[in-house]
Amino acid sequence: MNAFPEDPGGAREEPAREGGDASPSHVTPPGSAGLGSVPNDVLTGPLLEIPRDPAWSGLDVVRLTVLSIVALFVGVFTVLFIAHFWIDPHSPLLSLARIPLVVVAGQALAYLLILGYMVVLVTRERGRPDFLAAIHWNWPTSPAVYLLVGILLSIALQLLASRLPIPKHLPIDTFFRTPAEAWVLAIFSTTLGPLMEELFFRGFLYPSLARGIGLPGAVFLTAAAFALTHGSQLLYSWGPVLVIFLVGMVLTMVRAKTNSVAAGLLIHVAYNGTISTMMFFATDGFRHLEKLNQ
């Protein structure tokens, strides 16, 4: 029995008719039924071009990566200058850059810019008017299944992390100094954050790699890239990076199995949401964040 619902858009083979002859001489090739009634000019005309899947190339993904890095700098610096000139003109830029709310706001702005370019790349540059179809969004018929998988995955990997060497203090901890910062990160990590990560890694990167090197290599490299992207927040410590790598493996395998980016998004949201919920209760509603370091 499959762990996940089958792709609703997938093709199914029709069973052979009872008593029918399944020999090749009696089988009509796909698309050849009724050819005798088709005009000759149709048969001799130019062949219809099969749409490229994915519509983008590896170079497009490289360009998207570079532009994403540029957008992150633009987004953070834009918010930084706004905070400096209109909110707190007396604080130096360097001190404002250490404020988690400024960083998250800049990252959110950058993500919106990146999302806009993703749509332009697919619909305008590659001629696919249906963006969601092109990236294989495919909202699953049983979303609760994937939410449950995300919750169980989060609990299981938190148990694993408790047995791994985790540094006492990580850069990500600076985002949990005040209740406001904790709330903002909790909301961001269950909305725009996982959406953009799934669009990039499972929507754009994975299918491009799968076409070039095959499914196993694409799953591994996508998960590795996903983990390395989070490495700076974790001091590249092998324990927490391994946990993120395993998350990436599960998300990418679900993408490969279900042909659905949305399925992975549901798991990702539930995974992050479970961690945020655990932290919420462990710190009395984010009011006693010092308990996280005890």
Residue ranges and their predicted role:
Residues 1-134, 162, 276-294:
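N-terminal, membrane-interfacial amphipathic/helix-forming hydrophobic leader that caps
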Residues 57-65, 96-108, 142-147, 181-186, ...:
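Residue-level signature of transmembrane alpha-helical entry/exit and packing/kink sites
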Residues 132-152:
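Interfacial segments of alpha-helical transmembrane regions
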Residues 151-294:
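Transmembrane helix-loop-helix hairpins at the membrane interface
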Residues 90-92, 126-130, 143, 178, ...:
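Alpha-helix capping and helix-coil boundary motifs
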Residues 53-57, 92-96, 136-140, 172-181, ...:
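Helix-boundary and loop/linker segments of multi-pass membrane transporters
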Residues 9, 121, 139, 143-145, ...:
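Residues in flexible loops and secondary-structure boundaries
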